[in-house]
Amino acid sequence: MTLAIKDGATEIDIVMPLGSMLEGDYETVVDEIQQQKEACGEHDMKVILETGMLQTAKNIKIASLLSMYAGADYIKTSTGKEKPAATPEAAYVMCQAIKEYYDETGIMIGFKPAGGLNTVMDALIYYTIVKEVLGEKWLTNKYLRLGTSRLANLLLSEVIGEEVKFF
């Protein structure tokens, strides 16, 4: 992480310590995330929850809240390597947790669904969840990011009306 920051990284992604989370060792989860945030300094840190491995809405909510209280600037559904990756259900739970955190602290936390966003409709689903649960002030690139490598070309193709292979 230190090397990435020295090389110019302005944001850092970390994966939540899933073993500790699934064992109910929340103190270790918070300690590890806080240590990583300390190493990030002023740089934004995204905590990846791997929601597919968390399996339940309860676990996803707990993981979301622990991450935010430990210093996450964003919470992210997944790396995209595990299946399932992002799901609308997980996104809804995460956005509810962000709203709860915001209502308690006044701090806006970003949200990033990643993995499995393959169509314009997928993007619209996540956009709508964020808009309905969190409100329009979250609909900026500061607070909503879509993690996808294919979607940019699909969106450009939709807008232009012909196939684009820019990215």
Regions picked out by a protein language model, each given a short descriptive name:
Residues 1-111, 118-149, 157-167:
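Alpha/beta enzyme core
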Residues 153:
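Metal-centered catalytic cores of metalloenzymes
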